Amino acid sequence: MASILDQYEDSQNIRQHSRMSTANIGITHSGFVNVRLEEEKPIFTKQRIDFSPPEKINQFSVCNNQLCMSLGKDTLLRIDLGKPDQPNQIELGRKDDSKVHRLFLDPTGSHLVICLTTNECVYLNRNTQKVRGLSRWRGHLIESIGWNKLIGSETNTGPILVGTSQGIIFEAEISASEGSLFNTNPDQYFRQVHYLEEDGKPAPVCCLEVERGLETKYFIIATTRKRLFQFVGKLAEGSEQQGFSSIFAQNQDLLPSFQEFPVNMGYSEITFYTSKLRSRPKTFAWMMGNGVLYGQLDYVRPDSLLSDVQVWEYTQDIDLNFVKPISIVLTQFHFLLLLPDRVRGICTLNGQVVHEDVFPEKFGTLQKMIKDPITGLVWIYTEKAVFRYHIQKEARDVWQMYMNMNKFDLAKEYCKDRPECLDMVLAKEAEHCFQNKRYLESAKCYALTQNYFEEIALKFIEAKQEEALKEFLIKKLVNLKPSEKTQITLLVTWLTELYLNRLGQLEADEGKQHLFLETREEFRTFLKSPKHKDCFYNNRSTIYDLLASHGDVDNMVYFSVIMQDYERVISHYCQHDDYSAALDVLSKHCDDKLFYKFSPVLMQHIPKKVVDAWIQMGNRLDPKNLIPALVNYSQMGSMQQINETIRYMEFCVYELDVKEEAIHNYLLSLYAKHKPDALLWYLEQAGTHVSDIHYDLKYALRLCSEHGYLQACVLVYKIMELYEEAVDLALKVDVDLAKSCADLPEDDEELRKKLWLKIARHVVQEEKDVKKAMNCLSSCNLLKIEDILPFFPDFVTIDHFKEAICSSLEEYNKHIEELKQEMEEATESAKRIREDIQEMRNKYGVVESQEKCATCDFPLLNRPFYLFLCGHMFHYDCLLQEVIPHLSVYKQNKLDELQKKLAATTQTTKARHKPREEDTVSLGKGQGSREQIKSDIDDIIACECVYCGELMIKSIDKPFIDPQKFDQEMSSWL
């Protein structure tokens, strides 16, 4: 048998369907043009399944992609739509004349209940091929089943509700298991829980629906031909498996809650729409005699599930005497009504017919329309054919309907991905709010539209709604792109003006201070907005002008801080004598240039705080740039300012270790004028060497001299090494001070003696103190009694000098004795040296024949050689080669010269084969000269052993490779 789903007929020509639409007109004052480039596809598209049933289709059901249909009298066709090429045909095996009355398929597609016209029911599970009878159900014509969606599974339905044609509601449970030996029936139990009637007579239970509300609350909806019943109750936590009988018991003592309509067409049908899988239904539609009752499902309401209900009355062409609606299906925004020859779609938002599809007569009368609650597909069948409806873009025109109903939030939700439609909704909402005097909401909506800016602004201005205008401008500003700088500048400036106007009005009204503070905070938040920081900065002069024109000093200062225009802020505080606040701004932002600019003013009024701030800044401030402020107010200010100036100068010198001469000179001048006690201490700790001094010595000398600080002058003279001037000035202060100066020139004994003579003359001639003059002799070993005698007057007796003269004579005698002893020691030393020389002449060494040179390791006796006391022996040429690299340039040149002379004397000797008699004298002289040359050469190269002497010690720190030849040596190894 061919598949019914994997093949389709060629697409049929789709007629233009009647549905809600709007002409394509441009949006007034909008940047959008509503143009549809191609014809939109209809919302409901019908497709016929390529399937020709071998027998007439009696009943049809589909759920969770599981399709079941009854064919003829005894055949059941079951198809898994996921595998449409594997249909499953099952024979019911009925011998009587019974026919299939209804097919009931649960939401999982696992449990199928087949109701027969003989008041019998059979059961078929998805996973079996065997049909099993439901014996407990016998005797009842089943019209509806309310499935348990929460605890139903593939093998067990859980407690379900069953409605019969006689108005009885049963509770039952079906299990797919084979059961025990004594109970093989799938129906676990079947018990009556309620009874429905109309006009005092039993009424068939057309539909049953069970839904769980919040927590353990349950709602049961049952419909008859004219009535819709609701049963509300709670089940104990964990008792869901026990069934729903307790809910009906809770409603037994109450009058049944139902809605009734007068017209009876013999049956009714209710349908639900669920937006998401396994969620609760949100809307319902009940097809009955008077029309279609539809609305929302509100699970919060205590006694009724239905809300916002309304009735769609049948159109005139639906005459219940001739043309009755057969089935109904509910979608998100429409319900589809199945008539004998057509399908009609009605929008639930406005009740308008938006779709109508007429079926050709060749397919026969339409039997029923079914919607798969899981997949959302709609199925329609006749006795000869099966059709399927696809629903696409159902919400595309919903926005317009909501807009016309003034439900703007919903309208925006359904057109958020269509800018041109969203703009229309916003414009309509803005106009609606404006007409209802909700100006702020109107402004927010207008700001999001593409309407002309000028028109909207004028609209609020004419209505004298500055707050709404401000809100409009704010929202418009937020939506501008950073590249739209001109528009941003315009809006920022305008908003600033509006804020300032509003603040001025509120400030004048004492009763609105709270609102004033809120508005000011809002304005300041606007001023410091990071998004518009660049705009404010580029147009800060304009903003300053606006703030100044309104006299809003506080906000001007606030804006200046935001713009980091601290100079303006500090100037403002200084102009209003708020110097502490000005200093706080300076200290907070640590701008050295601003410190230099405003310190003179601040130092005049708050010197201590200013100096504290300077000290806190530390090295970030250059003290030289602060001198003008310090000099100005140290000359004309109070003592406090002077003390603070000295404190900062001391901080610079002692803490920051500033070496600028100007700073040290200024501190000297302050000490000289105001703290003379600190002057001498400063000079002493500053150092005694010129390289350690950071002040101007001449300036310091002049300063100390002007103020009469002689001791300080002496100290400066000493540093300047003007010892004579220092001694002369020190003698005016203290002789001991002069003595300390006289000993300073240690390397110049003549000067020291001269200075001590000055001191001695002063002591003798000025103080006339002979004893003190004698003490000068003991203090300086350069002075003798004869040096100071000329300073004494003639009438002084010798008794005053007796001790000094005796002491001098004793020193002379002692010195003579020392000289005699030194002479004797020198004579003795000379004698020992002569003895050593004589001993050396008699020394010798023994050289064995097998001895070898310490350098070349060849036999020593083959060539001239040297023998050292240490035992090392070298050939003459080997020793020469070892020593030359270690000789100085001078000695190398001298050695070279001696070798040339030696070679010359050797040549001369060889040329004289037979010396003449007269040449004997000259030959002796030449022989002596040659020996002298050899001796000189020996003194250079053989003065010490090359391995044991100083040459070897000095070579320790020499590199193995000559630095000049290092690169060459390095390259040779590569």
Curated annotation (Swiss-Prot):
Which InterPro entries does its entry note?
A: Clathrin_H-chain/VPS_repeat, Pep3_Vps18
Task: Give the observed phenotype of the deletion mutant.
Answer: Mutants display hepatomegaly associated with large, vesicle-filled hepatocytes. They also have defects in pigmentation with reduced numbers of melanophores and no iridophores.
What are the GO cellular component annotations?
A: endosome; HOPS complex; late endosome membrane; lysosomal membrane
Which CDD domains does this chain map to? Answer: RING-H2_Vps18 (cd16689)
The record's principal subcellular location, in a coarse class, is membrane
Q: Which molecular function GO terms apply here?
A: protein-macromolecule adaptor activity; zinc ion binding
Provide the membrane topology annotation. Peripheral membrane protein
Taxonomically, which superkingdom? Eukaryota
Outline the residue ranges of the record's RING-type zinc fingers.
853-948
The leader peptide range reads none
* Pfam families recorded: Pep3_Vps18 (PF05131)
The answer to whether keyword Coiled coil applies is: yes
Q: Where in the cell is it found?
A: Late endosome membrane; Lysosome membrane
The segment annotated Disordered runs over: 905-930
Q: Which residues form a coiled coil?
A: 461-481, 799-852
Summary of the function given for this chain in its UniProt record: Plays a role in vesicle-mediated protein trafficking to lysosomal compartments including the endocytic membrane transport pathways. Believed to act as a core component of the putative HOPS endosomal tethering complex which is proposed to be involved in the Rab5-to-Rab7 endosome conversion probably implicating MON1A/B, and via binding SNAREs and SNARE complexes to mediate tethering and docking events during SNARE-mediated membrane fusion. May be involved in vesicle trafficking to the hepatocyte apical membrane and play a role in development of the intra-hepatic biliary tree.
| PANTHER family documented for this protein | VACUOLAR PROTEIN SORTING-ASSOCIATED PROTEIN (PTHR23323), VACUOLAR PROTEIN SORTING-ASSOCIATED PROTEIN 18 HOMOLOG (PTHR23323:SF26)
Specify the protein name.
Vacuolar protein sorting-associated protein 18 homolog
- Which organism does this record belong to? Danio rerio
Starting at the broadest rank, the lineage of the source organism is: Eukaryota, Metazoa, Chordata, Craniata, Vertebrata
